[in-house]
Each structure stands twice: as C-alpha cells, then as structure tokens.
Amino acid sequence: MAHATLPVRTGEKYRAECIRWMTEFKPDLFVTFVFNRGINIDEAQRTFEKFHGYIDRKLIGRAFLRRPDKRSSYIATVEKPDTNIHIHALFRMSDIQKLRFCLIADGIWETLVKGGNLDIQVVHCAEGVADYITKELRPQTSDRLLLPRHAEISSSR
C-alpha cells in the first residue's frame, strides 16, 4: 500500500514545486493557445515557438535573435495532447510589450493556425494561474513543460 501512494506524493510534490517556480516567475499575461483541430504535440510545440518568434520580432524588431535579454519570457504547458490539444502560457514582459502583445497576438496566431484562437488575460494572481496550468503536470508528463529556447541557451552559458 505504501508503494501505491508514493507516485501520488511525488507527483504532488513535483506539481507544488512547479507552482512555486511559476509564481516566482511573476507572469504578466496568461494566454491559452487553442488549435481547434487535430495536431500532434510536436507540431503544436513548433507552432507555439514560431508564434513566440513572430511576436518578439514585432515587439523588439528584426534583431530580436541577437537580443535575448529584450525578448519576452514564458513558461508554458501542453494540455490534452490526445483530444483537444492546447497550450497554456505565462508570459513576462515589459508594460509596453504587454500592451502591444494584446493588440497583435490574435492576428499572428490566426495567420499560423487557421481557425485557432487565443484567450489573453492579465495575471492578477500568479499562484492561481500556476495552479490551473499545472493541473495535468506530473514528472511523467514533464515533456509538456515548455520554455523559450533563448532562455535555455543563455542559462547554459
């Protein structure tokens, strides 16, 4: 019986640590990216990363790849990969970037995902949105946790 409860405790501890980490990230925006069509997890991730590149190019300019310190940051999770796949993302950015993001994000997403849609919300309670986007996150589903490539590269230097 003790072995049966161990994975639950480990999963709960993992999720609690993710919630703490996401809360400390201090996100500004909570965005849900909906595909509204069948798509696999790899294609969903590639499309989301493409969106991030497009949005940062609009926010920062053509040299956005050479300016990782100016780029928007996010922590995202892929949810329901076998049925109604969508991505929840917590973004952190400057106030002006946040305003511009809200004005242009829908158009960029519609260009990338015909029939897809976004739900963009200002974060008022980081712990609450972190709790929500981690509801399916466990150690065995940690591959559904997405971070920007520029953050991975700069943290490994």
Residue positions per predicted region:
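Right-hand nucleic-acid polymerase module
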Residues: 1-85, 93-157
